[in-house]
Swiss-Prot record:
Family label: Belongs to the glycoprotein hormones subunit alpha family.
Self-association and partners: Heterodimer. Glycoprotein hormones are heterodimers composed of a common alpha chain described here and a unique beta chain which confers their biological specificity to the different hormones.
Source organism per UniProt: Meleagris gallopavo (Wild turkey)
Name recorded for this polypeptide: Glycoprotein hormones alpha chain
Role played: Shared alpha chain of heterodimeric glycoprotein hormones. These hormones bind specific receptors on target cells that in turn activate downstream signaling pathways.
Xref: PANTHER family: GLYCOPROTEIN HORMONE ALPHA CHAIN, GLYCOPROTEIN HORMONES ALPHA CHAIN
Subcellular location: Secreted
Disulfide bond entries: 35-59, 38-88, 56-110, 60-112, 87-115
Molecular function via GO: follicle-stimulating hormone activity
Highest rank taxon of the organism: Eukaryota
Classification via Pfam families: Hormone_6
Swiss-Prot/TrEMBL keywords: Disulfide bond, Glycoprotein, Hormone, Secreted, Signal
SUPFAM superfamilies, alphabetized: Cystine-knot cytokines
Length: 120
């Protein structure tokens, strides 16, 4: 009998931990592998009820290809592979002025395009 109680306690503990993890990550973020696709997402910081503000969020895939020989000759440290990164950016937007003359862009369409700002 004591053996069954231990198994039941362990099973309930594992189930509680699993349910806790499931509720910790809202909107299915826990189940999502990698990064979501590039799309519009509501910016909860600037949005007001009835006046949502959207921004582009998500990931775009980078591509890699062999470095052309003429480019390799000009490199200080020659690389065999060249990569080209793309970022999720606004394809179209409208400018909005909030309180205190704060101007922001409300994105209306997103796409993957060349990254202009890179982290160092």
């Amino acid at each position: 009998m004591d053996c069954y109680r231990k198994y039941a306690a362990v099973t309930l503990t594992i189930l509680s931990v699993f349910l806790h993890l499931l509720h910790t990550f809202p909107d299915g973020e826990f189940l999502m592998q990698g990064c979501p696709e590039c799309k519009l997402g509501e910016n909860r910081f600037f949005s007001k009820p009835g006046a949502p503000i959207y921004q582009c969020t998500g990931c775009c895939f980078s591509r890699a290809y062999p470095t052309p020989m003429r480019s390799k000759k000009t490199m200080l440290v020659p690389k065999n592979i060249t990569s080209e990164a793309t970022c999720c950016v606004a394809k179209a937007f409208t400018k909005i002025t909030l309180k205190d003359n704060v101007k922001i862009e409300n994105h209306t369409d997103c796409h993957c395009s060349t990254c202009y700002y890179h982290k160092s």
